[in-house]
């Protein structure tokens, strides 16, 4: 797919009073269980899944495929999506050999990556507290790792499966999130664009690609689990390996923030395994004691898994922009945040 140059310098201001929310153009589809030291994951509010999940720690060679696990209501192991119609614009055109359609699993250990090691020395990412708000400003370029070479070159082995023709381009994201988020009256759906940001300074999207499939399985990403969409927004669909490696076994670490202000955490058991869907609620979160705002406290938070939907299945709190905006997009369908456009892998 050819890159959409009109949006290379687009400015996205979400959550600032009076700011234009220009999300519709920006989030077009892509071209592409053990308790930890913090006290564990179980809580009285947790709902238990039957599918899709595994009864124990997920085998990276046989991760349950998330295709079809899309809902318009919160469900454990699903993405509650604001988008219900998909345009078939995912970059991945051919299933790679890492996907086993018979067992409905995929292997993260044998999946190929986009080649290249492109540095971004001018990348910026800042988080600061202003009163009752957490202000996050970032340009969406990775601050602590390289990216692959995009567009994917025809000489790259990845090109056989994914012809992502988009570029990485500097963006301007300026978010004002609640410092102490509160549960919403009811959970809300996730849009097709940013649902949060990770601490490498890169936007986080939900688990769906432009065709409504499991993006982690189908889309060919770079070595740090990223790729750009047609608006040239570089993004992740899960917690990438370069961040997972930074979390020691038996510890819990805050690795990002969702649009509703809640934290996104990696929780590793003593032997290095991550929780599964059965440990988490319908929004892919739980309530337990973690480090938050400089102190240990019992709060709700999202938790990363190796299995779909990976990070945020729905919003537990009220995402910024949920009330609509003055820009061309307004709010997403179903009362979700702005930009209910087709997902990007």
Where are these regions (language model features)?
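N-terminal secretory signal peptides that target proteins for export/translocation
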Residues: 1-13
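Sec-dependent signal peptide hydrophobic core
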Residues: 14-25
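Cleavable N-terminal signal peptides
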Residues: 33-35
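Solvent-exposed N-terminal domain segments of exported/luminal and surface proteins
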Residues: 37-213
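Extracellular/lumenal glycan-associated surfaces
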Residues: 171-177, 198-202, 229-243, 295-309
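Short helix-loop boundary/capping segments
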Residues: 212-222, 230-276
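Disordered, low-complexity segments in secreted/periplasmic proteins that are enriched in proline
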Residues: 324-345
